């Protein structure tokens, strides 16, 4: 049995978890509501203030989905209570970020500013002009929005200029040595 999958997920106060007969899990909390459909090869039950995930059989796919399903539901519960956030930093001369209403405007060395629309349920905060914080209840969407922002100008291999996650180590290549 999966070591992760067999652990029950405690439901904190103020969080409501519902499981429909077709394996759709709905988690409601202070930070919003999340809903996700899971495959029928796993059984999801709410009992004694905990969510318990079990599997029907023991083949490879069912074993894989057992731990995955438990981890996703645990992230849904954490998301509606605490939320998730991902921080990015902009490195480079003249590179900056600004917020205009619900749009993030990035000036990162292109001939034009790049505009990114804020998605519903995801909050984008600009601190100073070189730090961006993406917040939300859905871990997957927070990570995807942060990855989309980073993709606008990935860190350069020679100077490290671009958009990177806070704490990300960018390995720099050595430049040409040239003739002397």
UniProtKB/Swiss-Prot annotation:
Q: What is this protein called?
A: Large ribosomal subunit protein uL6
Write down the superkingdom of origin: Bacteria
- Gene Ontology MF terms: rRNA binding; structural constituent of ribosome
Q: How is this protein annotated for GO cellular component?
A: cytosolic large ribosomal subunit
Provide the alphabetized UniProt keywords: Ribonucleoprotein, Ribosomal protein, RNA-binding, rRNA-binding
Q: Name one Pfam family in it.
A: Ribosomal_L6
InterPro entries for the chain: Ribosomal_uL6-like (IPR000702), Ribosomal_uL6-like_a/b-dom_sf (IPR036789), Ribosomal_uL6_a/b-dom (IPR020040), Ribosomal_uL6_bac-type (IPR019906)
Q: Which family does it belong to?
A: Belongs to the universal ribosomal protein uL6 family.
Gene name as annotated: rplF
Taxonomic lineage of the native organism:
Bacteria, Bacillati, Bacillota, Clostridia, Thermoanaerobacterales
How would you summarize the oligomeric state and partners of this protein? Part of the 50S ribosomal subunit.
Query: Which cysteine pairs are covalently linked by disulfides here?
Result: none
Q: Gene3D superfamilies per the record?
A: Ribosomal protein L6, alpha-beta domain
Q: Which PANTHER family match?
A: 60S/50S RIBOSOMAL PROTEIN L6/L9, LARGE RIBOSOMAL SUBUNIT PROTEIN UL6M
Gene Ontology process terms (BP): cytoplasmic translation
Could you confirm whether the keyword rRNA-binding appears in this record? yes
Q: Which SUPFAM superfamilies match?
A: Ribosomal protein L6 (SSF56053)
- Nuclease listed as a keyword: no
Function recorded in the entry: This protein binds to the 23S rRNA, and is important in its secondary structure. It is located near the subunit interface in the base of the L7/L12 stalk, and near the tRNA binding site of the peptidyltransferase center.
